[in-house]
């Protein structure tokens, strides 16, 4: 049927139902939800949890936890991770409730802010522009390399003493391990980050948390701005 829309008409679009991957197993565990609407979900991920299954950690991932949340609440959406975090990074993760919403978000700038605990006393603020590439001898490790992809991070120091700094970091690009690689590059690896030279006697997971997300909603066209506290990192800073 061909019909020309008229002022005042209401148009309803029903997205097709998606079927989750058969490899995903629902992981029933309480989910820390900080924002939800018909299209998006923002949750707070703990440390020691993958966003998605991997060979080393095939189950109990965040996406499987969200899948269980769908089942428990009779929701038929299929979650898609939009902003992924490393296994040991904590904080905010944005998920889309449909592949089409995920696609729309891929064309929207998402501002992300992190809090990092690093070795040594950092400068009051800084800009790190250094290309990042995969290390030749590893499929996991990244490094600053002239052959890498452009990467830019900016930071400001919130608190600092001789052996440790608490920094607010803003990503301007989204390379794998970007903050971890950039802070190693400037001589201030993240505390607890053994992969990038930040070993610590008491802390064995890197101290990094995504504390803020801001973007324009792909459907509602309003600004979504979510911020969480970082009390744990402040406690660690005071302890060190």
Description of each model-found segment:
Residues 1-240:
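RNA pseudouridine synthases
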